[in-house]
Amino acid sequence: RKMADALPFGRARRDFWRDYYFAAGPRAVADGKTPVENALSTLLVDHQSRAARAGHIAFVGGGPGDPELLTLKARRALDEADVVIYDRLISPEILELARREALMIDVGKEGFGPSTAQETINDLLVEHGQSGAQVVRLKSGDATVFGRLDEEIDAVDAHGIGWHIVPGITSASAAVATIGQSLTKRGRNASVRFLTGHDMKGFADHDWAALARPGEVAAIYMGKKSARYIQGRLLMHGADRSTPVTLVEN
């Protein structure tokens, strides 16, 4: 413990103990106290001579909310994170999986409601990435679907911070699994559209005439408050009033 105190608190010290317990330690412990002390001393010198690890951002898809639907890679990223910057829709059960010492930052957004500005989120990513932290940017569903991912990647790229993407199960896939349906069906539809119910200007506009055609299938995200608007636009463009619609929440 006294040797590890020579290293700065946080990732450097955690890396030291990981290397000891999973490599140097097991090899030395069978030979007694002196080999263990020597192994600790040698490992400490090695870690003190290392350059500080660069910060890194993992853009992680948190899935639809059930922690059992997280990927193993997402679970590992949470376990190794120094900082977790998470969205409003991330469930408490998933947040519980983050490393206990991690700094947790809520950057929740809500359509037509209080939200953290995107510029603030970008600044947080850059700030913690430049500090050398391993950052998890935790987004609900899949990070690449309606998550403003490109803007955040551009922000960290502009400052030379490394990043990678961990995909997650998108809400549309989880929703149809819950109700025992599929997004595509032979003889019914050869394509499916992912749409958003609202954008930065308000209710989102789409190619309503195309969507109103028979056999079209769409998964509409963030569509609860815009449901009447969407219904009206589809009917205006000739949609059959008997077209089936399924609403899935939580």
Regions found by a protein language model. Give the residues of each.
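Class I S-adenosyl-L-methionine
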Residues: 42-59, 77, 81-169, 174
